[in-house]
Curated annotation (Swiss-Prot):
Its EC number is 2.7.4.6. The lineage of its organism: Bacteria, Pseudomonadati, Spirochaetota, Spirochaetia, Spirochaetales. It catalyses: a 2'-deoxyribonucleoside 5'-diphosphate + ATP = a 2'-deoxyribonucleoside 5'-triphosphate + ADP; a ribonucleoside 5'-diphosphate + ATP = a ribonucleoside 5'-triphosphate + ADP. It comes from Treponema pallidum (strain Nichols). It is found in: Cytoplasm. This is Nucleoside diphosphate kinase. One of its GO terms (cellular component) is cytoplasm. GO terms for biological process: CTP biosynthetic process; GTP biosynthetic process; UTP biosynthetic process. CDD domains: NDPk_I (cd04413). Its cofactor is Mg(2+). Homotetramer.
């Protein structure tokens, strides 16, 4: 098993609907270790860098508008197979395919505003973590309860 650090963004809808604690606890209950957290307003330039691979897709303008519309919570989690685990917890990006019990299945209302972003690969995680955090933002710590998860 790979010990990884991954990036998660709780999108504006999570804050607007007062779901931050509930969504955050889903990751914590699976034993992921929170190593960085920021509440921020994403500017257009950062949003465009983050979602550059979607630039030519029809939903790109609305995605950028959504991400920059209100604050987001940027998170870094560490754990065994963290990237895969986080994506499983989040569920399908398409709301109609998101299973009940997943974050999107339980809370997302529309695909275009699917409430959470999660890195899909080690390369994406590294790029996204660097986009939202600097080295001093990370707190390395050993969770004494880690072996119980």
């Amino acid at each position: 098993m790979a010990f990884e650090t991954t990036f998660v963004m709780l999108k504006p809808g999570v804050l607007q609907r007062r779901l931050v604690g509930e969504v955050l606890s889903r990751f914590e209950r699976k034993g992921l270790v929170l190593t960085a957290l920021r509440l921020l307003c994403v500017d257009t330039a950062t949003a465009e860098l983050h979602y550059a691979e979607h630039r030519e897709k029809p939903f790109y303008p609305s995605l950028i508008a959504y991400i920059t519309s209100a604050p987001v919570v940027a998170l870094a989690f560490k754990g065994e197979n963290a990237i895969s685990l986080v994506r499983t917890l989040c569920g399908s990006t398409r709301v109609e395919h998101a299973q009940p019990g997943t974050i999107r299945g339980d809370f997302a209302l529309r695909t275009t505003t699917n409430i959470v972003h999660a890195s899909d690969s080690p390369e994406s995680a590294a790029r996204e973590l660097a986009l939202y955090f600097s080295a001093q933002d990370f707190v390395e710590w050993r969770d004494g309860n880690y072996d119980f998860f």
